[in-house]
Design a protein with these regions (language model features):
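Short helix/loop capping segments that flank catalytic or ligand/cofactor-binding pockets
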Residues: 15-16, 168-172, 239-242
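Short, compositionally biased low-complexity segments
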Residues: 5-10, 92-112, 160-188
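Glycine-rich, mobile lid/loop segments that gate access to catalytic sites or pores
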Residues: 117-229, 235-236
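Long, well-ordered mid-to-C-terminal structural blocks that present hydrophobic/aromatic surfaces
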Residues: 228-252
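Active-site nucleophile/metal-coordination loop of metallo-enzymes that catalyze phosphate/sulfate
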Residues: 12-138
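Beta-sheet entry/capping signal
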Residues: 2-5, 42, 157-159
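Beta-strand elements within well-structured catalytic alpha/beta cores of enzymes
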Residues: 2-14, 36, 219, 227-231
């Protein structure tokens, strides 16, 4: 038997005044969902137990039978495994979003974040941005000094891996939660100030490399947002998950 798991991630949404105080889901005409619910089993479950973050990275682990309190080690390690990036003990993985910051040569910390995805940059443009960073002498030297690399991706969310790293002493803030805000207070910080500075310095340097880079200017000329920055977040270390097929006799 085949199973289809449909996850309405964030579908509940919030009440909207223009909809009479209803959520979009409450307001919508959804006869198919209503029919499935009427013929199925409906209930409540806590997929994001406290103190873990309420997000897809914890919820999906739980939905597929892994206790996130035991097995959750961050979003990025799971994404790394999905694309074949092998983490060894001591490695830490990070999302390295390609972002759009306010254009211009004002101080980096005074810029605002315009888009957590650089306007959903994808394809060759996204690959060209990471290639520009990896080929820049100053940025590539800084990466090597940090014992890090950035894996290219045809999307706005490449992954970065840092060897010999414990990220638990640094606070990394999700960029999508702070659109339109000044980035200075949002940069990596925490009790491990030296490690936080490594990431903040790389983010600052990336903006300097990308602000007037040809791929940035090309996108702006096309009326798109330029990917003039990177943003590290979603940190995590190598995860060890139970074998799904061994436990449930099924695979995907």
């Amino acid at each position: 038997m085949k199973y289809l798991v449909v996850i309405g991630d964030g579908m509940a949404d919030n009440p909207v005044e223009a909809l009479g105080g209803k959520t979009p889901l409450e307001y919508a005409d959804i006869p198919t969902i209503d029919s499935l619910a009427a013929r199925g089993t409906v209930g409540s479950v806590v997929n994001c137990p406290k103190p873990l973050p309420a997000g897809s990275e914890t919820a999906i682990l739980s939905i597929f039978g892994c206790d996130p309190l035991k097995h959750f080690s961050g979003r990025s390690p799971m994404e790394a495994a999905a694309i074949g990036l092998r983490l060894v003990p001591g490695d830490a993985a990070f999302r390295c979003n390609l972002v759009a910051l306010e254009p211009g040569d004002q101080p980096y910390e005074e810029k605002r974040i315009l888009s957590h995805s650089a306007g959903s940059i994808a394809g060759q443009d996204a690959l060209d941005v990471v290639a520009a960073l990896n080929s820049d002498p100053e940025f590539s030297a800084a990466l090597r000094a940090a014992d890090m690399y950035i894996d290219p991706s045809p999307s706005f969310r490449p992954l970065a891996v840092k060897h010999h790293c414990d990220p638990s002493g640094v606070c990394f803030i999700p960029p999508h939660d702070h659109l339109g805000e000044v980035i200075g207070p949002l940069l990596p910080s925490g009790k491990d100030a030296a490690l936080a500075k490594v990431f903040a310095d790389l983010m600052r340097l990336a903006n300097r490399v990308l602000e007037h880079h040809p791929v940035t200017e090309k996108r702006r000329a096309e009326g798109k947002l330029g990917a003039n920055g990177i943003w590290f977040w979603a940190e995590g270390t190598a995860a060890s998950l139970p074998d799904f097929k061994a436990r449930y006799g099924a695979d995907g």
